[in-house]
Amino acid sequence: MRDSRVTEQRNPRTADIDLASALDIVDIIAAEDRRVPDAVFGQREVLAKAIEAAESTFRRGGRLIYIGAGTSGRLGVLDASEMPPTFGTDPEMVQGIIAGGPAALTRSQEGAEDTIENAVSDLDACGLRADDLVIGIAASGTTPY
């Protein structure tokens, strides 16, 4: 059975990228990257609501907690780790949790994302409070973790 999620499908625009010249590879990647602003623009209302939710969370003393698996989790941890040096925030204000724990930052932890119970346990371990905002990051939108 073939996985129908868009994140698990081949991109027809990059199907033969491995056969392309270096310059053509750059052109293919640049063409795909140019699609991002339109995608962001199409979700601007949803993104604005997320920003407003984060602002409200911070104003009442809550934390922003990213949670995700694999690359999605790594990006959450990366963003959280950049907040103190970039914006001077307390390291507790924005946190990142990745399925499989710190080891998953450098090596794949297969199966760590497969149960919601792992996510609940990790959120409990960080001392999740009612005033916190949790943002789950998943490319497919279907990862249990």
Model-predicted segments: where are they?
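Cofactor-/ligand-binding subdomain signature composed of acidic, glycine-rich
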Residues: 1-39
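Short secondary-structure boundary/capping elements
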Residues: 17-21, 46, 111-118
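Short, glycine-rich nucleotide/cofactor-binding loops
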Residues: 36-45, 134-143
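Active-site cofactor/substrate anionic-group-binding motifs, chiefly glycine-
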Residues: 51-104
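Short glycine/serine/threonine-rich phosphate/pyrophosphate-binding segments
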Residues: 72-78, 130, 137-145
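Glycine-rich oxoanion-binding loops at beta->alpha junctions
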Residues: 82-134
